[in-house]
Design a protein with these regions (language model features):
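Residues at the beta-strand->loop junction immediately N-terminal to the Walker
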Residues: 62
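Hydrophobic positions on the alpha1 helix immediately C-terminal to the Walker A/P-loop
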Residues: 72
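Nucleotide-state-sensitive switch-loop elements of NTP-binding domains
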Residues: 8-59, 67, 76-162, 167-184
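Conserved SF2 helicase motif VI
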Residues: 187-189
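Switch/coupling subdomain of P-loop NTPase systems
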Residues: 1-2
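Conserved beta-strand/loop subsegment of P-loop NTPase cores
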Residues: 172-177, 192-202
Length: 202
């Protein structure tokens, strides 16, 4: 990543406010980095932008792996961008418990949406964080709001009933499930069903 001084950081801040996607990606990378200098730079950027956040509609989407979250997001995202909306997708991928790596492959499932000029797609590793999101998802949401995205979709890791943290940072929490999912005992347990605003049968 680029070595930043105050001038470069101020330039980055200005470009994020102008909605430049490359600069937004750099700002999110700074926020997600574990390097101390990057954390210091990120704090500087976020402090400068704290009064610039716009009120975007934030939608969280969860569901078991393979239920079709990415496909649903691309379909919804294309419809929104074609209606003139600016949307950001924050796709959280699981990190390996063995080596800490992450494939970050969700963007490849949104090929059509990734070509839209009004769309920003950012895959991020969860780095072992519980709750379906990463430790810096809140910061990424704030940066997307500053960049002028009207609708922010947060796609969780997709591992099941523990994915509740995203519901606390979004306005609408959607659960995608396949037909005939679960049994009677699962229905009694409820779990994530209790906090879902919308249940989508995909």
């Amino acid at each position: 990543m680029t070595n930043f001084n105050n001038n470069k950081l101020n330039e980055l801040i200005q470009k994020v406010k102008e909605g430049d996607r490359r600069s937004l990606a750099k700002a999110i990378t700074l926020a997600e980095s574990t390097r101390q200098d990057h954390q210091d730079h990120s704090k500087f950027v976020l402090d400068k932008l704290k009064n610039n956040s716009k009120n975007a509609l934030k939608i969280g989407l969860t569901g078991t792996p393979g239920v079709g979250k990415s496909t649903f997001i691309e379909t919804l995202g294309l419809q929104l961008t074609q209606n003139g909306k600016k949307i950001a997708v924050l796709a959280i991928d699981p990190s390996s418990a063995t080596n800490g790596g992450s494939i970050l492959g969700d963007k490849t499932r949104m090929e059509l949406l990734s070509r839209e000029t009004n769309a920003f797609i950012r895959p991020s590793p969860n780095k072992g964080s519980l709750g379906g999101v990463s430790k810096r998802t809140r910061e990424a949401i704030r940066l997307c709001e500053v960049a002028g995205y009207e609708i922010i979709l947060v796609e969780t890791v997709g591992v099941g009933q523990s994915e509740t943290v995203v519901s606390e940072m979004t306005d609408i929490f959607c659960l995608l499930i396949a037909p005939a999912s679960g049994d009677e005992l699962q229905g009694v347990k409820r779990g994530i069903l209790e906090i879902s605003d919308i249940i989508l049968i995909n």
